[in-house]
């Protein structure tokens, strides 16, 4: 009998146990990450051929206790390696674990290698070579409890998840053995259809089709670790291989065609999935089609039951989570609308995104996918008419969009607002950025029922997609939390993904995910346009310049010079990129990273046109003291007056609710202020006249 160890992914041990028992294996002992078992040579070969769950299968050679380096060398040398592999075979030692005398695993591997080579050298006056890339023989040592060493021979060669069929894949797919574990945990019945609406390289469907057609996972593998083992029984392996081939020939004929359907929005990915399925020999029973989740429908008759199984993107793979909520909302609604009495099984690393399915799971399984802790949730789909005919948010959004559409087209705008907390039950903002939509949710107070608020948010996401004809994949969700610390900006993610938005004759880089704000305020659109008109031949100063959008207009308006000042290095760099995007790169355009309040006190420069759009409050760590607009604006005006030329103009803009400047105080400074809010308020921001304010300020002559 052979003493063996089958390693597996964490969380799949019970599935591996069931699999090995079905093959006839006995004396099983489960540990975390694998199973010890005994078998004869026939069952050994069968477990290698048929295990869909195991990662590798090892022959356990010896377990011993080591107290020093000499013990390690002596115990390894005591094993008769010349009876295990030939001198002409290459080998590799993998050592796992450390203690007080084996400080790193490479040292442990080196001592082991020396002992093996010395044994061959002493017996044959020659030695086998080490191959770090593709060795014939792989020797594994695992150090447990500081001094208990397990030494094993890897009979698999390459990991067993490498079935040989998946030569084409996108990014980092789930390993085949983990995919099988997910399939087996999903509640799938082999006699019912399986649909993967985001199939990628097709792994779930191919593994399920292999199970259904009795196709052994090891059937296509050409090279195995045991083939270089001296005890390799070639005839017995041939028998196992021929038996597996015969089972597949019979099994594939019994399978129903089109019981496996895979969709993906990318035709190139679908081509790869088809090639993989063809390599596995199961393409004839899988249908791959180019289609996104928006267009997912049930193609089977009403009484047919089946399963939707998928591993949607969850932030780690492609995008940040806030870009993916719409995808999960759409998937949940589609499942409930078209797949009555089906099952839904979703594998994800994000419980946050899974909540947007708006479904209650009846089963949960926990797995490790590489370094990620993942969860598989299984749902029973009961009929629910998700196509609500009347919804107040949908009606209001539709009304707003129709009202604005003609104006949007005439102005040729790519960025605009279509909804701003119009309804008490839908306290959100909806902004359009070309083909993208950003939905900003104001965090509901604790007095509001969380489930109701969450349901309304999901409805808003879905109806935004419907009304604006936007791809569900192009909706970004953000939550605006009441800022107790009152810091101005906070980085949320680090995607560094930018899109270009056109506004009249200007272009801007916009980031929809990484910050609370995107880099472009649509409410300041006409202020920017006015600055472009006023800037011709002027020296222009932009204070609290943010991403420099106002500076771009001044530059395009042929300003004599521009100066942008902001305390944030991130936004100064962003400003420079926006200027470069508009071919404004000459030395007349200056960017200064500095505290604006300190800079206006110390500068000796004079300006013809000054734009200031200060925050309501700021207490940046880079500032010596906090800034409060209502408290400090008059002090700021005193210093602005000193740097404003005699015929100069200040455009003072604010987004602070109900803020008004004191005209009498301004007059005492020998300045004249005129409110111009009505002249520069865009049609998509008319409902917020108490928030957006602008004044034109000049010297009294």
UniProtKB/Swiss-Prot annotation:
Gene Ontology cellular-component annotations: cytoplasm
Top-level EC class: transferase
Positions of the THUMP domain: 43-155
SMART domains: THUMP
Record keywords: Cytoplasm, Methyltransferase, RNA-binding, rRNA processing, S-adenosyl-L-methionine, Transferase
Keyword Cytoplasm: yes
One Pfam family in the UniProt entry: Methyltrans_SAM
MF GO annotations: 23S rRNA (guanine(2445)-N(2))-methyltransferase activity; RNA binding; rRNA (guanine-N7-)-methyltransferase activity
HAMAP family reported in the protein's UniProt record: 23SrRNA_methyltr_KL (MF_01858)
Functional note: Specifically methylates the guanine in position 2445 (m2G2445) and the guanine in position 2069 (m7G2069) of 23S rRNA.
Family: Belongs to the methyltransferase superfamily. RlmKL family.
Protein name from the UniProt record: Ribosomal RNA large subunit methyltransferase K/L
Species the sequence originates in: Buchnera aphidicola subsp. Acyrthosiphon pisum (strain APS) (Acyrthosiphon pisum symbiotic bacterium)
